[in-house]
Amino acid sequence: MTDKSIKELALSVGRPVEKLLEQAREAGLPQRTADDIITTEQQDTLVNYLKKVHGQESGNTGKIALKRKTTSTAKVASTSGKAKTINVEVRKKQVFAKPNPEQIAAEAKARAEAEAKARAEQQAREAAEQKARLQTEQKAKATLDAMRAAHQQDSAAQSAPKAAVVVKKRGGGTVKPAPKPAETLEQKKAREAQTAQLKATEEAARRKAAEEAQQRTLEQMRKMASKYSNDDATATIRVIDDSPLASGLVGQAYEDSFNQEDREIKRGGATTNPRAGKKGGRRGQEEQSFVNHNKRGLKSSQANKHGFEKPVKKQVYDVEIGSSIVVADLAQKMAIKVREVIKTLMKMGELVNQNQTIDQDTAALVVEEMGHNPVLVSDTQAEDNLLEAAEEARGEQTTRPPVVTIMGHVDHGKTSLLDRIRRSKVAAGEAGGITQHIGAYHVETDKGIITFLDTPGHAAFTSMRARGAKATDIVVLVVAADDGVMPQTAEAIDHARAAGTPIIVAINKMDKESADPDRVLNELTTKEIVPEEWGGDVPVAKVSAHTGQGIDELLDLILIQSELMELKASAEGAAQGVVIEARVDKGRGAVTSILVQNGTLNIGDLVLAGSSYGRVRAMSDENGKPIKSAGPSIPVEILGLPEAPMAGDEVLVVNDEKKAREVADARADREREKRIERQSAMRLENIMASMGKKDVPTVNVVLRTDVRGTLEALNAALHELSTDEVKVRVISSGVGAITESDVILAESSEAVLLGFNVRADTAARQKSDQDGIDIRYYSIIYELIDDVKDAMSGKLAPEHRETILGVAQVREVFRSSKFGAAAGCMVMEGVIHRNKPIRVLRDDVVIFQGELESLRRYKDVVDEVRAGMECGLAVKGYNDIKPLDKIEVYDVQMVKRSL
């Protein structure tokens, strides 16, 4: 650093001049203006001050961090029962701080004092132990000598009478020894007791000597370990001492030393000479013993630590069972092989494989049979907990706008009526003039906010109407005044009743001359819809979407009904709602239409819908205008879910991503189990139905639509087209553009590729042109259904239709050498053809069926003979013709059938 002005210094460090002057003043520097010069020493002073202020010490911290990363692999069990290999990465970090010199000197001095004190204490302890050991040995030796002397005296006293005493006789002969006195019982018992006491004393002395030898060995190993731990040059040994390796080595050395001394004591010899050994001296023996048993100690430690311990008794598990469970998953929870579970199920009369699903009761019986404890749990426990937590976080409830669903028959003017209310032109933009998915709108009228759901009226959209009735507060039933109650009108009434939703009848098209509202009311009465003016409880409004007649009256009825229902919701807490519709847009991903029912939905919220979850990245209203939040009864479109959820799925905002993932995975697993169960049931039904029957022609379909609701409706409609003679099978269906994989699938399965309100991408078009696959696009649902019907009709076998061309009566029978029996006939009706099949009838009963061999008029061979004329004919291969028989000529035509 060099001397420079405050302004130059501020420019070099990138800080404002005023801020730098303020910091210099706080550091005690004299500079006050931007042109003042600051020296190098003053710059150092300023830097040290700033470091101190920000919690940093000037100078080096004296710390060093060591990091180590190791990677290994491990095998774990998966849900399928097979082991899979995963990578395990272990990261270690250790920070060493360098102490200052004063601290090092103080620690060295304290360590030296502690070592000197410990050494003095150790020497004093060893001297005391040596003195005590000598005293103990002397006492034991004195006691042992005294007992041996007493024992010898007793033995001498007992053996004295046994000695042979030789006495010379007076006559020069010898005297015989005195006879041996008999040992009494008391003397025998005393001798045995004395012997036992002597043995016990010797055993006690031997045991005490062994304990002292073991203590000496332990002290030797302690000194050796202390030597290694105090050696600065071998600092790494301190780390190793705490490891299982060091424990095994030292422990094995202790054990070997004790065993050696025990063997020497039992042999009656002294302990090993401490000065013996190759290195000489006590230390040499210790180190040699430590080195010799290094390898054996390692093996012993590892064997003791990782040895298998056999279980004392069978493990009993608490097995959690939901409403259904896969056999393989059940076996894994009980830690047994799948075949054991299958055997148990076979004993119970159930024939299943490892991938099949069994119900909760059957699984509980299997678990009890296998000796474990079944725990019955709810599949929706996690979802219920989330809902309860969301309800607890709700604030005060306030009045919310009503949600009104417009329902009725196709072309009765539902969307046009909603257009008049919204003052827009939605119906003109619908393909074919009919609504093909649920439209959600909220309308701000002079009388308040109303949210409308416009449902399709076509027969194929039954599930959509059912969802609309379930998510609504009020149903407006639109009936055309000139058409009356139709099938979808009656279906809408049933949906509204099933959902328990009040109904308001709107008789539309009152501006037409053919309008007959009384007939409509009579037909509604047959469906138990009695209007208020007839003494019932159903409000009726006579409206015209074309002229606007009765619109205000209809809105008043809706708002009055909502006030009577006291609709309330909380605008606070996590949002909760229902999926109205979902689609996949190119470049945007999954677009989900949601009706918020409780709480407030904000951008950035974590949304759980069906088996998918994600954060709201963007949100817009029904007109495509971006918004940041939406309250109760407001329909919105959101982006952020990884895939399009099913229409009708419940939507919930959660705070914990882990819980959202758990609930989504649980829902996906339940859906998978249901699909497996459904497929297995279908396979069984197909096997039973196909027994004894020939193959049925099938029309394969690959279907792609723009929204989920339309996909569901088309799947149901195509499934209902199947008959006993020809089937419709949807190979694949999905939401979004037609892709190359769809074209490949259609080619391999010989399927028809249909797109509803979607188009094929570039790769799919190129592939279809290359392989000659026809892609059909539709925007009106009944046109798609009609084309599939035509394809099914092409698979039907043609019908054989017979037409009687003419009838001739036999008048006389002649014999011919060439033809045999020849009949002279009169043509009664029609025309007799020579090359057409015939039947011979006798008393109006068919007795022969064949063809003519010859047809003549007089002597001429002719091709046909008309009514009222005579002819002669011969039947090929039949000679039993009699008078009054009838010859019937007919023709068989192949007629193409249609559904």
Swiss-Prot record:
Annotated Pfam families: EF-G_D2, GTP_EFTU, IF-2, IF2_assoc, IF2_N
Region of interest (G5), residue spans: 544-546
Protein's cellular compartments: Cytoplasm
Keyword RNA-binding: no
InterPro entries per record: DNA-bd_dom_put_sf, EF-G-like_DII, IF2_assoc_dom_bac, IF2_II, IF2_N, P-loop_NTPase, Small_GTP-bd, T_Tr_GTP-bd_dom
Chain intervals for the UniProt region annotation (G2): 433-437
Binding site for GTP: 408-415, 454-458, 508-511
Region called G3, residue ranges: 454-457
One term under GO cellular component: cytosol
Recorded GO MF terms: GTP binding; GTPase activity; translation initiation factor activity
Region named G1: 408-415
Entries under PANTHER family matching the protein: TR-TYPE G DOMAIN-CONTAINING PROTEIN, TRANSLATION INITIATION FACTOR IF-2-RELATED
Protein name as annotated: Translation initiation factor IF-2
